[in-house]
Amino acid sequence: MALWQQGQKLYLPPTPVSKVLCSETYVQRKSIFYHAETERLLTIGHPYYPVSIGAKTVPKVSANQYRVFKIQLPDPNQFALPDRTVHNPSKERLVWAVIGVQVSRGQPLGGTVTGHPTFNALLDAENVNRKVTTQTTDDRKQTGLDAKQQQILLLGCTPAEGEYWTTARPCVTDRLENGACPPLELKNKHIEDGDMMEIGFGAANFKEINASKSDLPLDIQNEICLYPDYLKMAEDAAGNSMFFFARKEQVYVRHIWTRGGSEKEAPTTDFYLKNNKGDATLKIPSVHFGSPSGSLVSTDNQIFNRPYWLFRAQGMNNGIAWNNLLFLTVGDNTRGTNLTISVASDGTPLTEYDSSKFNVYHRHMEEYKLAFILELCSVEITAQTVSHLQGLMPSVLENWEIGVQPPTSSILEDTYRYIESPATKCASNVIPAKEDPYAGFKFWNIDLKEKLSLDLDQFPLGRRFLAQQGAGCSTVRKRRISQKTSSKPAKKKKK
């Protein structure tokens, strides 16, 4: 691949740039398929914020959160294969390729309700029924709304990327005064389990730009709302972060309100005429915003509880699970019902209603089940393949224990027996323990090392896959078995 350099006046032949190879050029598929699935995955918590109860904590479990599953697959190079002639361990390495995936969700459909007991909504700017020219020091109100409706399903072998806006460091020459608006910049981060989706108030770091703590619903008050950076992931040269994605977003503006506060960037008299009293100062801010609404939730527009077949990925990685890892990013607030639990405060049954005699609690529950169809593949260890993987994803070669061997040393080495003893010198050239590159991130870890099966017809997704291949559940899948053939004709038995 060759690109023209920007700013050059003489158009010389561009400098060639190394191309990223499609995984299909060096990965051979074996047509051996496995089914893998999880148990029923459940999570329960408070829908708005974590709650401390003694030494324990009720986690925050909101329908507006991402669920990011880090799926560990077994190493196929240490796998008990049905046919030992499938590959040559001295010349090849085995990898997994994703063929199908299904994310199943339980629980009934329900709108996601959020809000704030002291929300900064000064006036109704939609219905003009009275004139207000002043604001008090505190005009906050109890407000509830249904969040923007979102469904997201994104699969890759590295974590998905999210984007958000946050405050930036101003230039040295631009000295900000107290109370001035800070500059903003767009940043990226891995989408982790529990990160908040964008629910109609923008993708931003609200902990940094929301000093009033009243401009947003409670569940995103001190959070970073992320939006998947589809543009960046689509341009990823390796194509590891996004094999494919499915999404559905739905929102409309239900109410239009005005924010309270001192507007330092108020419109000038170029945009309006002053009143007959000669007062040109606007008493009410012109900062309008719309309260989002996700509207109708229906089974007609669900992207879950259905299979997805991966024939061609959008990037150069056609579904290969490098390092035996998959990252499944899910966002779904169409099952956002929150339970209200009321308990008598003194433990005795109530005979008449008295709000001071019972406690109320808030809980949200989620239910998932994941299923995959995996194909066994092999990668031939050639100089070109090793060079390509070294530049693309060096950790793959490290896990395969492939590297440049140092020359044999002619110096006599010393080996101490009790190297950890206080009587022995401190050990040198100690090989550090292998670190998990995702140790500092939060994911829902799923171990499928012992969950793979060749009997596809015993599972719902497996039967659907067989139907795609034109085979029914009654069809016996023949496994390839190496047999020695003889050139001598078979002798007929005498009757």
UniProtKB/Swiss-Prot annotation:
One Pfam short name: Late_protein_L1
Disulfide bond listed as a keyword: yes
GO cellular component, as recorded: host cell nucleus; T=7 icosahedral viral capsid
GO biological process: endocytosis involved in viral entry into host cell; virion attachment to host cell
Similarity comment: family membership: Belongs to the papillomaviridae L1 protein family.
Its biological purpose: Forms an icosahedral capsid with a T=7 symmetry and a 50 nm diameter. The capsid is composed of 72 pentamers linked to each other by disulfide bonds and associated with L2 proteins. Binds to heparan sulfate proteoglycans on cell surface of basal layer keratinocytes to provide initial virion attachment. This binding mediates a conformational change in the virus capsid that facilitates efficient infection. The virion enters the host cell via endocytosis. During virus trafficking, L1 protein dissociates from the viral DNA and the genomic DNA is released to the host nucleus.
Protein name (record): Major capsid protein L1
Species this chain originates from: Bovine papillomavirus type 1
Lineage: Viruses, Monodnaviria, Shotokuvirae, Cossaviricota, Papovaviricetes
Name of the coding gene: L1
